Design a protein with these regions (language model features):
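A late C-terminal transmembrane helix in Major Facilitator Superfamily
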Residues: 335-368
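Extracytoplasmic gate region of multi-pass secondary transporters
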Residues: 18-25, 147, 212-275, 361
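Primarily marks hydrophobic transmembrane alpha-helices of the MFS/SLC 12-helix fold
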Residues: 66-69, 92, 286
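Hydrophobic core of transmembrane alpha-helices in multi-pass small-molecule transporters
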Residues: 11, 79, 91-107, 228, ...
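Helix-to-loop junctions at the C-terminal end of transmembrane segments
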Residues: 52-65, 269-282
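Helix-loop-helix hairpin linking two adjacent transmembrane segments in secondary transporters
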Residues: 134-186
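C-terminal ends and interior cores of transmembrane alpha-helices
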Residues: 74-87, 292-305
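Cytoplasmic helix-loop-helix junction between adjacent transmembrane helices
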Residues: 96-137, 333, 339
Length: 368
């Protein structure tokens, strides 16, 4: 049940945030703002997501997942509810940028990693990588679900009302999460699986459950840089994908479906990563995933000269299957090396690489 909960929360976390790609064109059409101005919204969203990581992780360590998940959904609902009244760039910078970025972190993998690691210690440790991979797959499922839903809402009632509806869904989600049986969810029933300071002591001598000590290890910075560099590359492309496909000649519906299909494929790519890494080694799988990402980006670039559906499919498939596939490997490694009471703060600090890389990548996408 813990993995299902974390999957659903990731579905809301990433899926709601990626709806920006669908809102971009109608907001641009009504407001007349430049693409760079609009890209700044998503850049702030990613920046807030990254900078909030260490704070959210600290909160998870101190007050637990229930409060963080509930508060995050409430903040997300507030951001979208206020965004429907936006008339100036700073309104969106604050709401769907800063507030939504913090909320996305609160209900995303930082909280999920701490919660899942509590349940997959000791005799269950071998199941940690698959559990994290399934949880990560919620991100792709969220894109697959919320992109077409948002497009239908915008086509039916307009982008402002669409933000309002999504805000209500998020508020309702906060109530549901608060009412869940957290006494059973927060701690494993087997005392041998408790996350005391002993939890991470046995398997990795290089690890530490203290953030200050973790920052002095090469493992922390290696994982941080994997997340950072990957995010720069991915977010050079992702926020502008729908607008780009429309600009080269595809219809808005086709572009949205392509982006949704891209999210659909990430579900399988991410879910399979943990198993493949266990069978063939993390290094081989990560290398293969980067090769697929590069192939997908090159394929998207060729659409400027040859905007045909076959080439679009050939670009979306490798890009979708590889996007996010590095995340489960990083999370599982961090959970093993830094298991303990300080895992939330450590993993939150590590995921600052995603936010900062995403912010830089998004800003560059608007400039270019």
């Amino acid at each position: 049940m813990v993995v299902i909960l974390a999957f659903v929360m990731n579905l809301m976390s990433r899926g709601m945030g990626e709806t920006f790609a669908v809102f971009l064109l109608p907001i641009e059409s009504e407001m007349g703002w430049t693409r760079a101005t609009l890209a700044g919204i998503y850049a702030l969203y990613m920046g807030a997501h990254g900078l909030a990581g260490i704070v959210v992780g600290w909160c998870v360590d101190r007050v637990g997942p229930r409060a963080v998940y509930t508060g995050g959904l409430g903040l997300y609902g507030l951001a979208f509810s206020l965004a429907q009244f936006g008339t100036a760039p700073w309104h969106f910078y604050l709401t769907t940028g800063v507030i939504a970025g913090v909320a996305m972190t609160a209900i995303g993998m930082t909280t999920a990693t701490v919660l899942i690691t509590r349940w997959y210690q000791g005799p269950r440790a071998g199941q940690l990588s698959p559990a994290i991979s399934i949880t990560y797959a919620g991100m792709g499922a969220g894109v697959m679900l919320w992109i077409p839903v948002t497009q239908v809402l915008i086509d039916s009632i307009g982008w402002r009302q669409a933000y309002g509806v999504l805000g209500l869904i998020l508020f309702a989600g906060a109530v549901v999460v608060y009412l869940l049986p957290w006494q059973r969810l927060s701690r494993p029933t087997d005392p041998g699986l408790s996350t005391t300071s002993k939890a991470g002591a046995g398997s990795h001598k290089s690890g530490s459950s203290d953030l200050r000590s973790a920052l002095r290890t090469p493992v922390f910075w290696s994982l941080f840089m994997i997340l950072f560099v990957t995010a720069v590359a991915i977010y050079l492309v992702s926020p502008q994908m729908v607008a780009y496909l429309v600009s080269v000649g595809f219809g808005a519906t086709t572009a949205s479906l392509a982006f949704s299909g891209h999210g659909f494929l990430t579900v399988f790519g991410i879910a399979g990563t943990g198993w493949l890494a266990g069978q063939y080694g993390s290094r081989r799988i990560v290398t293969l995933s980067y090769a697929m990402t590069i192939t997908g980006i090159i394929g998207l670039a060729t659409l400027m000269a040859f905007p045909v559906l076959l080439l679009l499919a050939l670009a979306i498939v490798p890009l979708g299957l590889s996007q996010g596939s590095r995340g489960p490997i990083v999370s599982a490694q961090a959970s093993r090396v830094f298991a303990g009471r300080g895992l939330g703060a450590i993993y939150g600090a590590m995921t600052m690489g995603v936010g900062l890389g995403g912010m830089i990548g998004t800003w560059l996408s608007g400039v270019l």
